[in-house]
C-alpha cells in the first residue's frame, strides 16, 4: 500500500486494519409496522439491545487490532471544513428527502442549523424528522394540507447500520453506489461528503469506480474482491447488469489498477438472496461459506478488456459450478462450506439469519452471528477461528457481520 493512499482493499480476507461502521440510532425507534415495507425492514429491532450487540461487534474488532471508524462521526467532521460545505450538505439532504414545499425547505434549513454541533444534526438527519418537531412551521400550503397524515417530513434511515451497501472499497478507490430504492439511495450522501471533504480523504488518491448519479443501481453487498486481479459482482435484486459493465470499464481501464477480470454472478431474485454476500463469503484462502442453493451450475460472465478495441469489454459466459469457477480464477483448490451443513431446513433458517454472511478479520479468522450455531460449529471443525457476536436484534434487519461493515484498509495478501 502506498503512503499517499487512504484506502486499500485487495481481498476479502487480508488482515483488517480499518473499518467503517454505523452504530444503530434513533432511526430504529422511528420504525412502525406501517412503515416496514417503505423502509425495507421485516421487523422492528429493540434499539437498546441492538446497540449493545453492535457495541460488542465493534469491541470484537478493536480487540483484534482493527481501527473502528463511525459513519456519523466522519460525516459530521466532513462538514466541519467550512460553512459553505455544511449549507450545501443540508440543502442537498433536504432535496433528496423529497421535500417539495419551499416554505417547508426553509423551515428545515433553519431547524438543522439550530443544532449546537454537527454530530447531533447528522444523527437527527439519520433518525428522521417528524412534523411536530418543526414547532414554528405553520402548515398552511396546499402541499401541507394534502400531506397532513404522514408523520415524517424526512424519512428515517434504519438501514444505515448496514454500511456495506452505500459504497464499497475496491483497491484504492470506491464505488459510491446508486442504490435500488429511494429509501436507501439517500444514505449515499454521507459517503459523498466524507470522501470529498473529510481531511482523511480529501486530496488523496481515491478514484470513484462508480458514482451515485448513475441511473442504474449497484450495491456494496454485491461486490466481493476475490483477489487483487479478480472482482466478483452479483447481478441481483439490487444490482443491474448495466452497472456491472460501467464498473468493469472504469476499473479495468484505470491506468494504475491490478484488476484484470470482473466476474458477474447472476443470482436468484429474492429477499433471501438479496446480495451476493448473502449467499457466499470468503473465510480463508481456499474456503468459502455458501448457501446450498447456489452451488450448482451458475450463470457467470467473465468480463475483461477487449484487446482490439479501446475502452471496450468482452463478456464470456462461464457455465460451471461455483467451486470450479472459483478454482479457475483463484488458481487453487476450493472448499465450499454449506450453510447449515446442507440440511434443507437448517440452511433455510440460518441463511435467513445470514449464516453465510461472515466478516473476515484475517485469513481463517471471521466474525459470525451466535444464532447460526450449526454453521458456526462446522466452520470451527474446518479450522476457522470464530469471533461470535450476539445477534437477536441486529439480525432483524436481514444482514450479517459483512453487511454491517465497510473495510477501508486491509493488508495485501
UniProtKB/Swiss-Prot annotation:
GO terms for molecular function: arginine deiminase activity. Its EC number is 3.5.3.6. The keyword Transcription regulation does not apply. InterPro entries: Arg_deiminase. The keyword Transcription does not apply. It catalyses: L-arginine + H2O = L-citrulline + NH4(+). Keywords: Arginine metabolism, Cytoplasm, Hydrolase. Pathway: Amino-acid degradation; L-arginine degradation via ADI pathway; carbamoyl phosphate from L-arginine: step 1/2. GO terms for cellular component: cytoplasm. It is found in: Cytoplasm. PANTHER family: ARGININE DEIMINASE (PTHR47271:SF2). Belongs to the arginine deiminase family. This is Arginine deiminase. It comes from Clostridium perfringens (strain SM101 / Type A).
Amino acid at each position: 500500500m502506498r503512503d499517499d493512499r487512504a484506502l486499500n482493499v485487495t481481498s476479502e480476507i487480508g488482515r483488517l486494519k480499518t473499518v467503517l461502521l454505523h452504530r444503530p440510532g434513533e432511526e430504529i425507534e422511528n420504525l412502525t409496522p406501517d412503515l416496514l415495507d417503505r423502509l425495507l425492514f421485516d421487523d422492528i429491532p429493540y434499539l437498546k439491545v441492538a446497540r449493545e450487540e453492535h457495541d460488542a461487534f465493534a469491541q470484537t474488532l478493536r480487540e483484534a487490532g482493527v481501527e473502528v471508524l463511525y459513519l456519523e462521526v466522519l460525516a459530521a467532521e466532513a462538514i466541519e471544513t467550512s460553512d459553505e460545505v455544511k449549507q450545501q450538505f443540508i440543502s442537498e439532504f433536504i432535496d433528496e428527502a423529497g421535500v417539495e414545499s419551499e416554505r417547508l425547505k426553509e423551515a428545515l434549513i433553519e431547524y438543522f442549523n439550530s443544532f449546537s454541533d454537527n454530530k447531533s444534526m447528522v444523527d437527527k438527519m439519520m433518525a428522521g424528522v417528524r412534523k411536530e418537531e418543526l414547532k414554528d412551521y405553520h402548515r398552511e400550503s396546499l402541499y401541507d394540507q394534502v400531506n397532513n397524515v404522514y408523520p415524517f417530513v424526512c424519512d428515517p434511515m434504519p438501514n444505515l447500520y448496514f454500511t456495506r451497501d452505500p459504497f464499497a472499497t475496491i483497491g484504492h478507490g470506491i464505488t459510491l453506489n446508486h442504490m435500488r430504492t429511494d429509501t436507501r439511495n439517500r444514505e449515499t450522501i454521507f459517503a459523498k461528503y466524507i470522501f470529498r471533504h473529510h481531511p482523511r480523504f480529501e486530496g488523496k488518491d481515491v478514484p470513484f469506480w462508480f458514482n451515485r448519479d448513475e441511473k442504474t443501481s449497484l450495491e456494496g453487498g454485491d461486490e466481493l474482491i476475490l483477489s487483487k486481479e479478480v472482482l466478483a459482482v452479483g447481478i441481483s435484486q439490487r444490482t443491474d447488469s448495466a452497472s456491472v459493465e460501467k464498473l468493469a470499464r472504469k476499473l479495468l481501464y484505470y491506468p494504475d489498477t491490478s484488476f484484470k477480470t470482473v466476474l458477474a454472478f447472476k443470482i436468484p431474485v429474492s429477499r433471501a438472496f438479496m446480495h451476493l454476500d448473502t449467499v457466499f463469503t470468503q473465510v480463508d484462502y481456499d474456503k468459502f461459506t455458501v448457501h446450498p442453493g447456489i452451488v450448482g451450475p451458475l450463470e457467470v460472465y467473465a468480463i475483461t478488456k477487449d484487446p482490439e478495441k479501446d475502452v471496450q469489454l468482452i463478456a464470456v459466459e462461464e457455465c460451471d459450478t461455483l467451486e470450479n469457477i472459483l478454482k479457475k480464477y483463484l488458481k487453487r483448490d476450493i472448499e465450499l462450506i454449506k450453510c447449515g451443513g446442507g440440511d434443507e431446513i437448517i440452511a433455510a433458517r440460518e441463511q435467513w439469519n445470514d449464516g453465510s454472511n461472515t466478516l473476515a478479520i484475517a485469513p481463517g479468522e471471521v466474525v459470525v452471528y451466535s444464532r447460526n450455531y450449526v454453521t458456526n460449529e462446522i466452520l470451527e471443525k474446518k479450522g476457522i477461528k470464530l469471533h461470535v457476536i450476539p445477534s437477536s436484534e441486529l439480525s432483524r434487519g436481514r444482514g450479517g457481520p459483512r453487511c454491517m461493515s465497510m473495510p477501508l484498509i486491509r493488508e495485501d495478501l
